[in-house]
Amino acid sequence: MKKLITRSCEEIMTTVYKPIEFVIDGLLAQGLYILAGAPKVGKSWLVLDMCLSIAKGESVLGQKTLQGTALYLCLEDSYVRIQNRLYEITDVPTENLYFSVMSESIGNGLEEQIETFKIEHCGLKIVFIDTLQMVRSDTDSSYGSDYKDLSVLKALADKLEITVIVVHHTRKCKDSDPFNMISGSTGISGCVDGSLVLIENKRGSRNAKLFCVGRDIENAEISLHFDSDLKKWIVTDELSTSKTKDNIFLAALYVYLKRHISFTGTASELVSELKEVTQEQFYPNRVTRDLVQNGYTLRKYGIDFQYKRTRNGRLIILHYDRERDSSDIKNTSEVTVNKLIQKV
């Protein structure tokens, strides 16, 4: 019998893990997602806009993207149709965007095809599979079958550290919960890391809502309008982000350590010291979380930290190394918290 591998609560809470990468800020993280909507509602236009934006590193749906290679498996289309759609949006070819109209199915070679593509294009960030049914080997839509197929794609996304989005259809019947309208069993929504459901307010109105839910994203309802000239879904309200408080803490810490180089003390003492550079209120019981969860960002700014146990509690030890600061502001003499917030 294989021994169960465990980690203690303290080990997990004090380890700096590689942060989850968002390919579309606040909307799509690494992992497996479902994008569902009624036939001909405009899912393909949304996917194509996402592909082009990620490949070029441009904003989409009002959110920043992580630039990288995008692969779009248009399994219900032809290259002629893809060409026509591309020319509707742009007349300039985009690097780092690739298409295919044929692929193997799940469990019969699809995973290997995507893995091979990742080896050949190491900058791969996202794969769109349009549609789910085109890569399934059978028509069984039971919970077990749905979960089994999707779990293969989830394992692939986790292994390659990429985002995989599977385009799917919604049921015709209405439901007060839009995620219940995703065709198939609850095995689909149960397996994926997130679900996006595009629902038109009225058929043909070109006004819609994109409902979003996921493990690494906040629940959101984004109001959209389809611009027939641009062939894009345009956000008609703002998608708020929740990272502002974290950004203020990191900015304050950076400004403080640029002045003092080092700090050793308790969380309460650190909160007190940060009042030197900002009037923002921080809380000692959140300091450890903020340091651990933003460990990779701190290293980018040349900040190392560790904890030391004493009889009176745990000490936080911080040190700033200018030589290891890879930010573009390290040579700036006067850095303030307000100026730095948007950069962190």
Where are these regions (language model features)?
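Conserved inter-motif catalytic segment of the P-loop NTP-binding fold
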Residues: 2-4, 10-12, 17-19, 23-24, ...
